[in-house]
């Protein structure tokens, strides 16, 4: 298990100074200085000899939502022990369902589901904003997820402050929006940090980089909330920031898109400088633009995130300021307004040749609704998109839905599409270098009652371990050819952060096991010796 990196967090005053400095730097140079001192670890092992690193790769993730206690905690005010038990249950479920990543909502409304000197504790933990839950949920989640072989991605909402409660007076005294009321824009029954304020952009980048620097997260994630979804013709009142900062633009929409573009680029740059193995991705609304508006848009007729939320996802893909996109394709196949197949095709074409991964946001929460009935409601989606060359996996909203109303549908999906575990996608930042871990040694495999217990020695720099079982006709040969035969998708038994794994599949005589290490970039290390099974 990789330890959680801890460091002394900056003070609020220091962050305010840094925010001002960063805002100036952004305006002058177009980049941020976060994490400039961090470097990649030294290469510790030769390249994996088999040349097939990647053929088991697939994102299988689920969102774990904290806002309004949608998933976790089940209600505010639970004890620390009760919250940890619920979180353990979700992580156990994710691992048991064959998932390999959880996207934990750590900043739902400019507050924190982790120990922060910058923003107050989220109200969804204790029932009161600023209430200390008595432990650090993110620190705990990272450690427990990694032990189970799950990536833990930190999910942030960059601008949202009040969710059905825009009154600044209801925020705790130390909330950044109350300390800086000029940052806040009320909109309907919500409130948002103004994306047009450079200090807001610098603040948000600082908050995110604080988490990246202090926690061993695998990714940083945004969902579909940028400028707010339109509400009955109501205008987002950013006149003040437009007048002060929009001078270089003739069109306010272009200026708003540029504000969001700058945030995306600055976050990506900061992560690359600090921890390049940490992925940064976005799950936008599923429609960029309709082809009736833009001939290069999708064959659809719904809300356009480019125009409604000023989120130019296509630009982020083409400019490489995101590592992946996970568009929310929450529509069934054959839906006239936005057909699932047409939308999957469009996004697949958009990422082609860019190096940006594509994961499909899947609507587990809709199972049971009209058009989403039947045990094949989810599987039929993957029947199509799972065969598209540009699709690298799926993320499900949400983990609670997978356990509850979508449980039967997910079981059918897993049987059809997830018969074997999958390694998480490898970071493109590792291209051009070999894996940073060596071969796994000391592997033993001992047979018991309907089980084989596989154990091995820890490897420096290993984030996860992948365990493979060789078929009987290749085990025991000990040759490089036999070892390479082992590290194939159909032989993967499991992925874990521990140095032991139990295989309960029926054992053939003569089968053996191979264990490989995955580094921070999720690159797979060299293949070691085959361990024969002993009684």
Mark where each language-model region is.
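C-terminal region of N-terminal signal peptides and the immediate post-cleavage residues
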Residues: 28-48
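Active-site-adjacent "subsite" loops/lids of carbohydrate-active enzymes
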Residues: 56-57, 65-85, 154, 159-214, ...
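Catalytic domains of carbohydrate-active enzymes, especially glycoside hydrolases
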Residues: 85-111, 214-219, 321-322
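Polysaccharide-binding and catalytic clefts of secreted carbohydrate-active enzymes
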Residues: 107, 148, 178-287, 291-321, ...
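Substrate-binding cleft of secreted/luminal carbohydrate-active enzymes
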Residues: 310-336, 347-433
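Pro/Thr/Ser/Gly-rich low-complexity, intrinsically disordered linker/stalk tracts
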Residues: 408-461, 521-535
């Amino acid at each position: 298990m990789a330890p959680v990196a801890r460091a002394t967090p900056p003070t609020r005053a220091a962050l305010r100074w840094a925010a001002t400095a960063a805002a100036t730097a952004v305006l002058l140079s177009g980049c941020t200085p976060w994490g400039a001192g961090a470097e990649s670890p030294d290469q510790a092992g030769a390249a994996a000899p088999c040349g097939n690193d990647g053929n088991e790769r697939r994102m299988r993730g689920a969102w774990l939502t904290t806002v309004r206690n949608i998933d976790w905690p089940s209600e505010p005010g639970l004890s620390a022990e009760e919250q940890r038990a619920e979180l353990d249950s979700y992580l156990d479920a994710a691992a048991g369902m064959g998932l390999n990543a959880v996207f934990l909502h750590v900043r739902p409304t400019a507050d924190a589901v982790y120990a922060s000197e910058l923003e107050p504790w989220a109200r969804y933990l204790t029932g009161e904003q600023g209430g200390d839950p008595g432990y650090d949920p993110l620190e705990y989640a990272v450690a427990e997820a990694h032990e189970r072989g799950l990536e833990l991605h930190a999910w942030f909402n960059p601008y949202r402050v009040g969710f059905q409660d825009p009154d600044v007076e209801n925020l705790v005294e130390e909330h950044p929006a109350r300390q800086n009321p000029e940052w806040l824009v009320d909109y309907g029954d919500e409130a948002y940090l103004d994306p047009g304020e450079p200090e807001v952009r610098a603040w948000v980048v600082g908050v995110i980089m604080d988490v990246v620097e202090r926690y061993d997260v695998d990714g940083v994630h945004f969902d579909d909330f940028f400028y707010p979804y339109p509400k009955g013709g109501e205008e987002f009142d950013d006149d003040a920031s437009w007048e002060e900062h929009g001078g270089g633009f003739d069109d306010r929409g272009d200026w708003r898109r540029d504000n969001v573009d700058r945030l995306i680029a600055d976050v990506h740059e900061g992560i690359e400088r600090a921890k390049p193995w940490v992925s940064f991705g976005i799950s936008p609304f599923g429609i960029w633009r309709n082809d009736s508006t833009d001939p290069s848009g999708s064959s659809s007729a719904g809300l356009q995130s480019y125009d409604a939320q000023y989120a130019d996802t296509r630009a982020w893909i083409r400019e490489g300021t995101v590592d992946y996109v996970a568009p929310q394709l929450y529509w069934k196949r054959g839906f006239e307004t936005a057909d699932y197949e047409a939308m999957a095709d469009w996004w697949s074409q958009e990422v082609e040749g860019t190096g940006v991964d594509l994961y499909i946001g899947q609507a587990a929460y809709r199972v049971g609704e009209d058009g989403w009935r039947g045990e094949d409601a989810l599987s039929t989606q993957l029947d199509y998109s799972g065969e598209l060359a540009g699709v690298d996996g799926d993320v499900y909203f949400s983990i609670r839905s997978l356990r509850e109303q979508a449980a039967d549908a997910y079981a059918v999906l897993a049987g059809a599409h997830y018969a074997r575990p999958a390694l998480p996608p490898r970071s493109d930042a590792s291209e051009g270098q070999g894996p940073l871990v060596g071969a796994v040694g000391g592997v033993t495999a001992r047979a018991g009652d309907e089980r084989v217990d596989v154990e091995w020695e820890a490897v420096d720099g290993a984030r996860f371990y992948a365990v493979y079982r060789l078929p009987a006709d290749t085990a025991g040969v000990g040759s490089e050819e036999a070892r390479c035969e082992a590290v194939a998708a159909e032989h993967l038994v499991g992925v874990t952060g521990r140095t032991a794994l139990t295989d309960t599949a029926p054992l053939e005589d003569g089968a053996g096991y191979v264990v490989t290490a995955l580094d921070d970039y999720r690159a797979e290390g060299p293949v070691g010796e085959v361990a024969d099974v002993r009684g």
